[in-house]
Curated annotation (Swiss-Prot):
GO terms for cellular component: cytoplasm. NCBIfam families: cysH, PAPS_reductase, PRK02090.1. Its EC number is 1.8.4.8. Keywords: Cytoplasm, Oxidoreductase. This is Phosphoadenosine 5'-phosphosulfate reductase. Pathway: Sulfur metabolism; hydrogen sulfide biosynthesis; sulfite from sulfate: step 3/3. It is found in: Cytoplasm. It is an enzyme of class 1 (oxidoreductase). It catalyses: [thioredoxin]-disulfide + sulfite + adenosine 3',5'-bisphosphate + 2 H(+) = [thioredoxin]-dithiol + 3'-phosphoadenylyl sulfate. Its main location: cytoplasm. It holds the Pfam family PAPS_reduct. One of its GO terms (molecular function) is phosphoadenylyl-sulfate reductase (thioredoxin) activity. Belongs to the PAPS reductase family. CysH subfamily.
Length: 244
């Protein structure tokens, strides 16, 4: 179908890409998450990949997509600063769901980065953005290239933050199709899916964390805080992977 010609869509300006995909996004909004995944696998170009931060609700998209494509490469960008509980969660889900896990890291180790640049996350928005570029964006770009990705699944939800509030199910990002099957799910739907499928939240959920990233830029939720304020000292919501 011409509307899913990735090369042709990549040649368009961003606003024209959005317009070209508007009709199909309207149709996708009417489907269930499972139906959306089926549609993507049938209509969008491979190779398919799924990214996961192994955060609070990570089990959902991992389970949802691997039920239909068990061997899909699962991309984790490991900064080296994840919580011990996150690494344990990764191991547990990889075993439980038999994930085809691909771990990507920055070219420079965490210790080497600190010796060269200091603690970038303590250097304001500019430092955080450089840190994210080194540890998230570049490794993800490398993963998409090495895995020859044509379609990238991710587990973002509109309810998570204002920056995600207008995201469509289907878009173009980093030169590939970006597909968000649970974009319209609320917290109740998340809970129900986890319960019905014998899946767990991230271990730190029970300790008051609403969102989990690196140890140095993640805070427990406290009364009066938004979920966005628990990450990057409230200066940013996105780590760079889902921007652009």
């Amino acid at each position: 179908m011409a509307e899913f010609n990735l090369e042709a869509l990549n040649a368009l300006p961003k606003d024209e890409q959005v317009a070209a995909l508007a009709a199909v996004n309207g149709q996708l909004e009417q489907l269930s998450a499972q139906e959306r995944v089926s549609w993507a696998l049938e209509n969008l170009p491979g190779d398919f990949v799924l990214s996961s931060s192994f955060g609070i609700q990570a089990a959902i998209s991992l389970h949802l997509v691997t039920q239909q494509r068990p061997d899909i490469p699962v991309i984790l960008t490991d900064t080296g600063y994840l919580f011990p509980e996150t690494y344990q969660f990764i191991d547990a889900l990889t075993e439980q769901l038999k994930l085809n896990l691909h771990v990507y890291r920055a070219a420079e180790s965490p210790a080497w980065q600190e010796s060269r640049y200091g603690k970038l996350w303590d250097q304001g928005v500019e430092g955080i953005e450089r840190y994210n570029l080194l540890n998230k964006v570049e490794p993800m770009n490398r993963a998409l290239s090495e895995l020859n990705a044509g379609t990238w699944f991710a587990g973002l939800r509109r309810e998570q933050s204002g920056s995600r509030g207008e995201l469509p199910v289907l878009a173009i990002q980093r030169g590939v199709f970006k597909f968000l099957p649970i974009i319209d799910w609320d917290n109740r739907t998340v809970y129900q899916y986890l319960k019905e499928n014998g899946l767990s939240y991230h271990p730190l959920w029970d300790q008051g964390y609403l969102s989990v990233g690196d140890t140095h830029t993640t805070r427990k939720w406290e009364p009066g805080m938004s979920e966005e304020e628990t990450r990057f000292f409230g200066l940013k919501r996105e780590c760079g992977l889902h921007e652009g």
